[in-house]
């Protein structure tokens, strides 16, 4: 069986279910509805929105709920697909990149953010958002909230501020996995999908990303490694898993295209990480 196929994704979900994990959306977690052990499935729909409908259908068949974050670009923002995913019982949110789109102009960015939020609220009462990494841009989209407050726009949660933050990780021992770079240990290719806050552990300053890596990413490279890790660690209480659905397909041609494109992107991202 090849990695990053829908069949493999189904096996990953099955391992989580067999491990006794409760599946909830990020919105539900923000509302205080989590019961441990739990996993939040987060999907960043960067491209190929149709692939997200495929994963959403598999999840619905298995009685699993997930959260899908859509960009405003045409490759992601496809109303019929968004509506179908909502009908399947999943949460959707805005995968915002406004600060990058407006080259750091915060007033223009927040105006654009507000308009796009209104757009997505046609399909779902969007209450959570998540930044798009925009790896080529020099602007971090999260910096918009240095000037503004997303709570003023009816938003109750943003994963990097409210879930994947140092204090929450320290208290709740949260683990974080992402398929960035088309692997589960792709930190060296990761520009922004990481945890940067600092923790004090045994009087030493370490990054919370280092903590999650030491706890989870040892020997976890492929999805099959991930499944084995889940089967070997039944005591995990809190976990967020981020996937990019465009990477997951049973179509051989699309699978090969994604494999080649990701190889090229990884080389470029590795250069960006070194420069920054």
Question: What is each PLM-predicted segment?
Answer:
Residues 1-42, 46-67, 76-77, 86-88, ...:
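Terminal accessory/targeting
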Residues 71-73:
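Catalytic beta/alpha-barrel core
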